[in-house]
A protein has these predicted regions:
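Helix-to-loop junctions at the C-terminal end of transmembrane segments
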Residues: 66-78, 275-287, 374-375
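Cytoplasmic membrane-interface "Motif A"-like loop-to-helix N-cap segments
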Residues: 76-86, 283-297
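Helix-loop-helix hairpin linking two adjacent transmembrane segments in secondary transporters
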Residues: 143-193
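Cytoplasmic helix-loop-helix junction between adjacent transmembrane helices
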Residues: 109-150
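C-terminal transmembrane helical hairpin of 12-TM major facilitator-type secondary transporters
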Residues: 288-335
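Conserved MFS/SLC helix-loop-helix module at the cytosolic interface between two early adjacent transmembrane helices
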Residues: 65-103
Length: 415
């Protein structure tokens, strides 16, 4: 009995490490092209900024549009098969970009890469929800999530050093990324357990009738819908920061190149300890999880507003640091843990895919809308205020829905 218990503990720890490394690999790809856009433009006969920017748009379009289908397939076929299939497509897409001699092939590669990545979120967090002890779940999700910050740093710094300082061809950077993805594919194959035949048979049997668990926890319950919307609002502010903060600091706050990079990286770097601390706090006081979420969201909204209202550079840096510490990176693992508690075990993959679909939709909306507002008004400040208002709105809706459900539960219990 002790051996079984030990094996189980070992497996959930392996999952946490492997899924964190998966995020590292994905975010290396996410950010590796951004610093070397000028080199890519030069190799393609100086195509326009809009055409270069569309590379990321194609990726996120495929990533978002495949979230829900991948969630359904994860529930049906299991995480291992979907991770292997997804990363295989991801590798092919990355190699297409590396070997491309024109913009069309790069767009096709971006679509394939985005589609391949789409299976990771629902696979990773349904695996952690199914295997990690509930008392450690939010902390485990925070460790998994921290891989994105590490990957972002490696991608931004690595491509800059290799291409700009060491004069490596930008295509070779993509070959390096593809090699990293191949390694991760091998790791998934060796570490992740496949879906047992007994589980498949049981799942097939369960499709004939709707379980009582699913009746109590539909994917579009009022509570889950409020979480989906809150996550959209949370991610809107984050992707506004990721996309437009460097430009805002340079054009409207007078930062120079080195300071821009430091300030932008600060948001991601300080997010890791914030996520680990608050997820541990959430695990320790599980009954107060909603209060932790509400507190973090309100402070994050205030910091988004203070970013543009700060009268000097010192206050601006304090606002950015606190946003990184208390914003999306901190609340992500707690929200993920909350979703895992509200959705039924059978539909975890679909629940997480819906959750991430709404969040990543903001990555498509926020950059474009901010650019439009900037063109019309000549400033990006109003966009930061809008993002803060969105976070407050999402938080209030979530608070009202959770309070209503709590009172309804108390009435039923006392009846």
């Amino acid at each position: 009995m002790s051996e079984t218990k030990k094996s189980g503990i070992d497996y959930w720890k392996q999952i946490v490490v492997v899924m964190s490394l998966g995020w590292v690999a994905i975010w290396i790809y996410h950010t590796v092209l951004t610093p070397i856009y000028p080199e890519i433009q030069a190799s393609l006969d100086n195509v326009s900024n809009a055409e270069i920017g569309a590379i990321a748009s194609f990726y996120f379009f495929a990533y978002c549009s495949m979230q829900i289908p991948c969630g359904i397939l994860v529930d049906k076929f299991g995480q291992k098969i979907m991770l292997m299939a997804g990363f295989t497509l991801f590798i092919i897409g990355t190699l297409c970009i590396a070997k491309a001699n024109g913009l069309t092939m790069i767009y096709i590669g971006s679509l394939m890469a985005g589609g391949g990545c789409a299976s990771f979120f629902s696979s990773a967090y349904s695996l952690s929800s199914a295997n990690v002890p509930q008392a450690r779940r939010a902390l485990a999700n925070a460790i998994i999530n921290s891989g994105s910050a590490i990957g972002m740093g490696i991608g931004l710094i690595g491509s800059s050093v290799l291409v700009k300082n060491m004069s490596m061809a930008w295509q070779n950077v993509l070959y390096i990324v593809a090699a990293i993805l191949v390694i991760m594919l091998c790791v998934f194959t060796l570490v992740i357990r496949g879906k047992a035949k007994s589980d498949s048979a049981q799942a097939e049997k369960q499709t004939q009738t709707v379980t009582e668990d699913e009746k109590r926890a539909p994917l579009f319950s009022g509570l889950l819908c409020s979480v989906y919307f809150l996550y959209f609002c949370t991610c809107y502010g984050y992707y506004l920061i990721v996309t437009w903060l460097p430009s805002y600091l340079q054009t409207e706050r007078g930062f120079d190149g080195g300071a821009i990079g430091l300030a932008s990286a600060l948001v991601a770097v300080v997010g890791v300890p914030g996520a680990l601390f608050f997820s541990h706090l959430s695990d320790k006081f599980r009954n107060s999880k909603v209060k932790v979420i509400l507190g973090l969201e309100i402070v994050a909204a205030a910091m988004l507003a203070f970013t543009v209202l700060s009268p000097n550079t010192t206050m601006l840096m304090v606002s950015l640091t606190l946003y990184g510490l208390l914003g999306k990176m901190a609340v992500d693992p707690i929200l993920i843990s909350f979703v895992s508690e509200q959705a039924s075990a059978k539909s975890l993959g679909r629940a997480f895919s819906l959750f991430n679909f709404f969040g990543m939709s903001s990555a498509v909306v926020a950059p474009t809308l901010t650019g439009f507002i900037s063109d019309v008004t000549g400033s990006k400040e109003i966009s930061f205020v809008i993002s803060a208002c969105l976070v407050v709105t999402g938080t209030l809706i979530f608070a009202v829905v959770t309070l209503y459900k709590k009172k309804a539960t108390q009435r039923i219990a006392s009846a």
